[in-house]
Amino acid sequence: MKEKIHPNYQEVEVKCVCGNTFKTGSTKKEIKVEICSNCHPFYTGAQRQIEVGGRAEKFRKKYGLK
């Protein structure tokens, strides 16, 4: 490898909008994220359950058919 051509890899702090912070390695000076594992619905269990029917189900519901 050539010397002095590679970016400096350092430990940085990742900051989420929810206030959670953690450390990781990066070539950037700081990292800001909008969502992390602390506030993501998949990890928190606060997922919304959506019942989605197909087009046929929508038609049946609209016209009162079985």
From Swiss-Prot:
Its cofactor is Zn(2+). The keyword Manganese does not apply. InterPro entries: Ribosomal_bL28/bL31-like_sf (IPR034704), Ribosomal_bL31 (IPR002150), Ribosomal_bL31_A (IPR027491), Ribosomal_bL31_sf (IPR042105). Keywords: Metal-binding, Ribonucleoprotein, Ribosomal protein, RNA-binding, rRNA-binding, Zinc. Binds 1 zinc ion per subunit. One of its GO terms (cellular component) is ribonucleoprotein complex. GO terms for molecular function: metal ion binding; rRNA binding; structural constituent of ribosome. One of its GO terms (biological process) is translation. Zn(2+) binds at C16, C18, C36, C39. Part of the 50S ribosomal subunit. Belongs to the bacterial ribosomal protein bL31 family. Type A subfamily. PANTHER family: 50S RIBOSOMAL PROTEIN L31, CHLOROPLASTIC, LARGE RIBOSOMAL SUBUNIT PROTEIN BL31C. Binds the 23S rRNA. This is Large ribosomal subunit protein bL31. The gene is rpmE.
